[in-house]
Amino acid sequence: MSWLEKIIPSISRTETKRSNKVPEGLWEKCVKCDAVLYKPELEKNLDVCPKCDHHMRIGARSRLNIFLDPQNRQELATDVEPVDRLKFKDIKKYKDRLSSAQKDTGEKDALIAMRGELKGMPVVAVAFEFAFHGGSMGYVVGERFTRAATVALNENIPLVCFSATGGARMQEALISLMQMAKTSAVIERLKMQGTPYVSVMTDPVYGGVSASLALLGDINVAEPGARAGFAGPSIIEQTIRQKLPKGFQRAEFLLEHGAIDMIIHRGEMRDKLASLLAKFTRRAAV
């Protein structure tokens, strides 16, 4: 074997090895159009597919970072943490599910609340973390929402909620159902005072959250293509034994049938909500 033949195979093996080393998380596939997207570019586009305009799910903290001005932020109710009061267990202990979700997301529970500014206007904003137990509402979510709404009430500044949830948290039973009444009550206090509450539904919004805080806004908004309803389409079809209309429970269907007030593209959310809230509060947006 010549010296050249000895070198060529090693070069070939090295090149093959290098070409297979693609960093994890660098690419993401759009679930709607199957386009393979470069993650850094996708993030610059606010996680909206540039090919088909599909709005992908984003984390609660990312959502608030996109929405609020970068300065003068204060996270609220960080002392409220989940407790397994019922010692619930199905195929897995609830406390183990909580630990796993906290490890995966880096969050204590499924809702983050912040006081901040939107184009210079003071606001309180809350966002659901769907990656944490499906964004389900238990004691912590209900309590954080209520405390955030109370801050908005006391300071008479708008409250904006970004929902992404499967509904009430099964593992907390009646405690989770109680949050529906608690959050609805504090929203009623906002309405009585005339403090604006804007509900923004992102994909998906179901169950006890849709039956309480998500559809009680002075303005109910949805992102394009977002699904919202009490029960999912498959459950409804099985119950009524009929085929549902195309696009049932999607934002466009809900707007057409008067269930929501408007659909706002993620890239326009800051500008349009700032304009709305400026009219509500008679404050000028910067």
Swiss-Prot record:
Single GO BP term: malonyl-CoA biosynthetic process
Enzyme Commission designation: 2.1.3.15
Note on cofactor: Binds 1 zinc ion per subunit.
Enzyme class: transferase
Membrane-spanning segments: none
Known pathway: Lipid metabolism; malonyl-CoA biosynthesis; malonyl-CoA from acetyl-CoA: step 1/1
Zinc fingers classed as C4-type: ranges: 30-52
GO molecular-function terms, A-Z: acetyl-CoA carboxylase activity; ATP binding; carboxyl- or carbamoyltransferase activity; zinc ion binding
PROSITE patterns: COA_CT_NTER
CC terms in the record's Gene Ontology section: acetate CoA-transferase complex
Reaction equations catalysed: N(6)-carboxybiotinyl-L-lysyl-[protein] + acetyl-CoA = N(6)-biotinyl-L-lysyl-[protein] + malonyl-CoA
Compartments, as annotated in UniProt: Cytoplasm
Residues annotated to bind Zn(2+): 30, 33, 49, 52
Subunit relationships: Acetyl-CoA carboxylase is a heterohexamer composed of biotin carboxyl carrier protein (AccB), biotin carboxylase (AccC) and two subunits each of ACCase subunit alpha (AccA) and ACCase subunit beta (AccD).
Family, similarity comment: Belongs to the AccD/PCCB family.
Entry function: Component of the acetyl coenzyme A carboxylase (ACC) complex. Biotin carboxylase (BC) catalyzes the carboxylation of biotin on its carrier protein (BCCP) and then the CO(2) group is transferred by the transcarboxylase to acetyl-CoA to form malonyl-CoA.
Cross-referenced PANTHER family: ACETYL-COENZYME A CARBOXYLASE CARBOXYL TRANSFERASE SUBUNIT BETA, CHLOROPLASTIC
UniProt-recorded name of the protein: Acetyl-coenzyme A carboxylase carboxyl transferase subunit beta
Gene field: accD
